[in-house]
A protein has these predicted regions:
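Sec-dependent N-terminal signal peptides
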Residues: 4-13
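Short, low-complexity N-terminal intrinsically disordered segments enriched in polar/charged residues
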Residues: 17-67
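Conserved aromatic-histidine-acidic binding/catalytic patches
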Residues: 24, 28, 124, 142
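A broad structural signal for short, well-ordered beta-strand segments within beta-sheet-rich domains
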Residues: 28, 113-115, 164
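Low-complexity, Gly/Ser/Thr/Pro- and Asn/Asp-enriched, turn/coil-prone segments
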Residues: 58-81, 85-87
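Surface-exposed, charged secondary-structure patches
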Residues: 76-139
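Short beta-strand edge/turn micro-motifs at domain boundaries
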Residues: 125-133, 137, 141-175
Length: 175
């Protein structure tokens, strides 16, 4: 009898771990992209208003990127040359707020920006991940626009939220 109960418990636990989750949708990807945009704008606003922009950036990295969920994250920011590929949360934070471990960083999020428009050209869904590629346009406080190209990969965390695990951004090639 005890053996039967133990087997049933183990079988139930194994099935709970391997049971498929709800598929990621285009709407899920759009929602996390909007949240990323809102967070980027919030970091800049806190900086401009004299608030704790570093805390907002840390909260953004913890909530939207996979670091706090135990995922490895590949981060290749738009405006980076000396340290183009970033493998740690500290290196990503340095890019956004500019006073970290990478001397070249000026604080991309401190511009500040007032809007980010995403234009996904394609999204690939595979199990508990989705990869989106396209162009996004950043509008700064003076109304100037900068277009960049991106590839973001999102992985579903244990709590069901999407986390950024690949962030690759670059400026368009000019002939």
């Amino acid at each position: 009898m005890a053996r039967t109960i133990l087997f049933a418990l183990l079988f139930s636990a194994a099935n709970a771990i391997t049971e498929p989750t709800e598929p990621i949708t285009e709407a899920d990807v759009a929602a996390v992209q909007q949240e990323w945009s809102d967070s980027l704008i919030s970091i800049g606003k806190h900086y401009t208003d004299g608030g704790d922009y570093q805390a907002v950036a840390k909260a953004t990295l913890d909530k939207l990127y996979g670091y706090a969920s135990g995922f490895d994250v590949l981060f290749k920011p738009t405006k980076a040359a000396d340290k183009a590929i970033r493998l740690t949360e500290a290196e990503a934070a340095s890019y956004f707020v500019g006073d970290g471990c990478c001397a070249e960083d000026k604080g991309f999020a401190l511009a500040p920006y007032t809007a980010v428009k995403w234009d996904n050209k394609g999204t690939i869904f595979h199990g508990d991940s989705a990869t989106a590629m396209g162009e996004y346009t950043f509008t700064d406080a003076g109304g100037g626009e900068t277009k960049a190209e991106y590839t973001f990969q999102y992985a579903k965390a244990a709590d069901g939220s999407l986390k950024i695990v690949v962030h690759h951004s670059s400026l368009p090639y000019k002939k």
